[in-house]
Amino acid sequence: MTVVYGARMPGLLLYKEELAACELRDDIDLNITVDRGDESWKGKVGFVPNICRDISPSVENTVALICGPPIMVRLTLPLFFELGFSRENIYTSLEMRMKCGIGKCGRCNVGSKYICKDGPVFSLAELDQLTGEY
């Protein structure tokens, strides 16, 4: 499994203990990056889409899971299309659409789905079937 995890700066990285444990595993290729490093940062510096481009994962037996700020998702999606990923094998999370989180307010309704109850993770193929803005 290959993981690309990014943050704006080192101090904003979450799950540091869990990431340290993942770095010890042979079955996880962990790529941690920050947009802006500081003098203490020894890791990669760069945007998630650029790190993904450098890795260039094979589409064979692979799915892409993209989670993050909308701008990062928008910049990363075209890369996976360029690499040949199908819309069925690209997943993203729409939790930013949720308000109440229990399906009562209707604010996260997109087509026939409630993001809070039916998601928040959907493939792009699933999202294509929904009407409305996502």
List each model region and its residues.
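FNR/FR-type flavoprotein reductase catalytic core
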Residues: 1-99
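Short acidic, gly/pro-rich beta-turn/loop elements at beta-sheet edges
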Residues: 13, 102, 126
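Alpha-helix termini
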Residues: 19, 81, 114-116, 132
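Local cysteine-cluster metal-coordination motifs and their immediate loop/turn environment
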Residues: 71, 95-120
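Short Fe-S-cluster ligation motifs
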Residues: 106, 117, 122, 126-134
